[in-house]
Amino acid sequence: MPKYKTSEQVLSLMKDRTRVRNIGIIAHVDHGKTTTSDQLLAASGIISPKVAGEALALDYLSVEQQRGITVKAANVSLYHEVEGKGYVINLIDTPGHVDFSGRVTRSLRVLDGSIVVVDSVEGVMTQTETVLRQSLEERVRPILFVNKVDRLVKELKLGPQEMMQKLMDIIKEVNNLINIYAEPELKEKWAINPTLGNVVFGSAKDRWGFSIPMAQKKGINMKHVIDAYSTTDKTKINELASQVPINEALLDAVIKFVPNPVDAQKYRIPKIWKGDLDNELAKSMLNADPNGPVVMMITDMKVDPHAGLVATGRVFSGTIRPGSEVWLVNAKAPQKVLQVSIYMGQFRELADEIPAGNIAAVLGLERARSGETLIDIRYKDLQGSFEKLHYVSEPVVTIAVEPKNPKDLTKMIDALRKLSIEDPNLVVKINEETGEYLLSGMGFLHVEVSLQLLKDNYGVDVVTTPPIVVYRESVRNKSQVFEGKSPNKHNKFYISVEPLNDKTIELISNGTIKEDMDSKEMAKILRDQADWDYDEAKKIIAIDENVNVLIDATSGVQHLREIMDTMLQGYRLAMREGPLAHEPIRGVKVILHDATIHEDPAHRGPAQIYPAVRNAIFAAMLMSKPTLLEPLQKLDIRVPMEFVGNVTAVLSRKRGKVLNMTQSGSVARILAEIPVSESYELASDLRGSTGGRAFWGTEFSKWAPVPDSILTDVILKIRERKGLPKELPKVEDFLS
């Protein structure tokens, strides 16, 4: 099918919303997600069928092709016919490697269905579970694709009965997860059932795949598969590919089981739209109305060397056209759309307009960032947005970068800025004291890939320090009240600190509790779910990004209102760099009990208020068993039984602990936790000790206290690295 015809067909079909499907492919790393995407593209005539699987059309960054993993979520619109009717399928490829899960979470918001790819031999892995859980939370309907079925014949040498058993086990495991994570009314409706056809078995690499209904129709069964792989001759495999082509099996299932945008938005908008569901914007979105006001959610920002910033996202309501005036809800800024287009592989094809229910690429939104909500400017006073996406992990590894050639400094700064626009999980900071540029990511791989992108895309060669793990400071006990005085002694703050309980930390981290919510609603949630006193919870005046809260327990303090903003800023600055090692503070409740404030504004500026607030908080922290928290990673390791001892030895050398171990057949599955600081050489150690026979996945687990036996050591090392005095701070240092 010639491509020019396709892009015209795609554009005309987009107007009929019942013929549109928005899907993504999600999976654990290396289970064959991008190869699956390629087969779907090849069938649409976007890549030639001969090179699909080699081409990795969606892996268009050279980093991805070298490493063979997908880093960016790429978009493409496909054309597919079922029973003579044409459909548009917007396909979004998402990364399966844990270091990039921020991108997965973002892509899910704009999908209505997902193809979950699982390797037939490895089965359901941690990352499969994480992405499936996230997609069910976003009300995205799953279809299952069990890939690499050829491995059951070639490597495990199973017969037809055993093969079916192995495949049924995977289906059972996926249904188990749907049962745990899907909402009650969707559990049964969305369960995977082979006889209905919402599961496809096949091999993406060899281009064949079938659902049970399709196999019955075409007279194919598992015996044919075993025969095809039992000879060295490829002809039988090619016959399979022409009898049951993978793209037909998957896309037929997508069209049958994934809802169109009109049906999907009815039940997805109430879940993902944070705002009044009765106003005009929400009503128009619930119906995916192309004639309503424009509402679009931006999921991805890319820097195109020729076109500038390209924003990609889904139009939930209205029709977006060049010249549309829109309002960015998060940036609080008006913008004008210059150009709209659809994706075909990595290329953008211009369009005159893109109606609700479709994925669009938009030029002209210089101020937009991933996660932005964009609405018709005439409706900017109607409040509401797609909730702040909560990503699954937070940046835990930092490196300092400087250009190899000092002349490249401005080029590097510009490149870092662009990278952080494209990837919100990458944090770029400047260390004011040393002038270093710090880059923080989700794990060693994330940071490594970002450096490679600097070199490939922006031509900047950088010198880096070894990766540094990020810590947090916290407390373990309740402190007494401390007085913090301003340098001029005219302002005093009386403050105590105590640790937040785990439930509160969880509610803030997952976005249930937010600083800007109604205080009564917040207090009710904290009382019912986290054992707070209702009256105390109502007095929360700040929650910062590192999960600390500030409570104003004062009554009738004169002039406090007037300096409130300055005091809050002082609190936030203190929370960014704690007393032990200048690392961010996490999980602390700060209570302001009383204050004395000078009546003359000249004597109560930031230079007086900041140190007073900070000193009281730091003194209180040092008296309440302060500690460092380190990031832990969850490991999910599959390894033959005979290597279990070697794996546990590697883990215990790295301060890891085994949480659970199960066995199926001759393979053990070990769930463990290990500090990120110890995981640097983990890959080579695990491979070395198991002769390369261990598969594993990692994922951010939680922050946990550094063991007391090494605490002082760790603190002193960080202080030395930051050029701070070698001795630990004392309470007296902060009391004047």
Swiss-Prot record:
Gene3D superfamilies named among the record's database cross-references: 3.30.230.10, 3.30.70.240, Elongation Factor G (Translational Gtpase), domain 3, P-loop containing nucleotide triphosphate hydrolases, Translation factors
Similarity comment: Belongs to the TRAFAC class translation factor GTPase superfamily. Classic translation factor GTPase family. EF-G/EF-2 subfamily.
Binding site for GTP: 27-34, 93-97, 147-150
Domain tr-type G, chain residue ranges per copy: 18-262
The keyword Cytoplasm is assigned to this record: yes
Record keywords: Cytoplasm, Elongation factor, GTP-binding, Nucleotide-binding, Protein biosynthesis
GO molecular function, one term: translation elongation factor activity
Classification via HAMAP family: EF_G_EF_2_A
Protein's UniProt name: Elongation factor 2
Origin: domain of life: Archaea
Transmembrane portions of the chain: none
Known function: Catalyzes the GTP-dependent ribosomal translocation step during translation elongation. During this step, the ribosome changes from the pre-translocational (PRE) to the post-translocational (POST) state as the newly formed A-site-bound peptidyl-tRNA and P-site-bound deacylated tRNA move to the P and E sites, respectively. Catalyzes the coordinated movement of the two tRNA molecules, the mRNA and conformational changes in the ribosome.
InterPro entries membership: EFG_II, EFG_III/V, EFG_V-like, EFTu-like_2, G_TR_CS, P-loop_NTPase, Ribosomal_Su5_D2-typ_SF, Ribsml_uS5_D2-typ_fold_subgr
Main location: cytoplasm
